[in-house]
Amino acid sequence: MAVSVFDLFKIGIGPSSSHTVGPMRAALMFAQGLERDGLLAATASVKVDLYGSLGATGKGHGTDRGVMLGLMGDAPDTVDPDTIAQRLEAVKASRKLALLGTHDVPFVQKDHISFYRQALAEHPNGLKLRAFDAQGETLRESTYLSVGGGFVVTAGAPNTKVLSAVEQLPHSFRSGNELLALCHSTGKSIAQLMWENERVWHTEEETRTGLLKIWNVMQSCVARGCGINNPDADGTLPGPFQVKRRAPQLYRALSGNPELALRDPLSMVDWINLYAIAVNEENAAGGRVVTAPTNGAAGIIPAVLHYYTRFMPGSNEQGVIDFLLTAAAIGILYKLNASISGAEVGCQGEVGVACSMAAGALAAVMGGTPAQVENAAEIGMEHNLGLTCDPVGGMVQIPCIERNAMGSVKAVNAARMALRGDGTHYVSLDSVIKTMMQTGADMKTKYKETSRGGLAVNIVEC
């Protein structure tokens, strides 16, 4: 499987890539399949079953909303977040849902979407969609797996996405060691290798434009989260806990006191925290975000990239592009050899992976060698090993928002530590990726995005 930078960084909506974006894409694929095969007009009803982690935390993660939007023909990267609540309320009031926006079927959420804690054999995040005719006969039944980061595969089918391109990649790699060997043999940086690989799928202009669009969405997300031209940011987050959004107040405090940087050399940490919190509060509110590589960890790469552009002398547009390409190369290693799904390996696969990606990318744009970049990425994951995914109330809020801030600061520290060395280190990135996957396999299910362990059972829902 060959993976593009645009597979790792996808524009979508919150609060979850695996539980909102993935199911939305699956439902859209299902509805489009009905239309493609001439079954849409004969469809009299649809039924959706959510399994495993989707069933356990799907309500808090917006899985039901994502599925409904997908059935209605919406895609994560184009749906208008500001219209979602109104449109779903219209479905509730009319008790009808328009498949692909054109074909009405009866739809009552509690009757047509079912939640099951029992997981499917293939993956903890499974969903089954069925379409029936007027006589109740099954027209189509499809089972999908949301495997993390918005990636969706059909259960029982090989993942054939871009397999034909593997041998065509000018710089094919599956491990950190192979990546370093390519850098050594070609004399190119990791970003340069990724840039040349992207030409298999995109022109150079398409790649540059696409990456800058990703960066633009990240910047817009931070701005909205800070309350810039977004009065809603001063309120509370959805859900029973009424968590107060903190980013706007923090933004006003920091921007209103610029001389603080002269008195407190660590004031930049406050800004890094702000950037991460702003993104993840927007994510928790269902706003527009970039999976990086997941929604639950969407604040780390934007926060560290904002740190680079704001605080690093000589930062420029090319540096932003190199940052994203380097981060994607590291993310690909986790995607190919481990997991980026909290339901499969815990939060080490989300915040841990994002921290590793950001650390390596920052080291690269700070002038690090490929060996130092690999070292930074390894440090970023090594000290997230064993991190559990225990969202309180099934919401992507506590501890997720603060955890992104902590992961962002940790990524900056990992990059700086690596740059103080020569790239020689005992634990390789490949070893830590393997260890992360093994640790995730050993982790009890209650600590893997089921809200049945950890903080999720020790915080009383009020």
Where are these regions (language model features)?
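Short, mixed-charge aromatic SLiMs
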Residues: S45-G58, A90-A98, L324-N337, E378-P391, ...
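C-terminal regulatory domains involved in ligand/effector binding and gene-expression control
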Residues: P76-L260
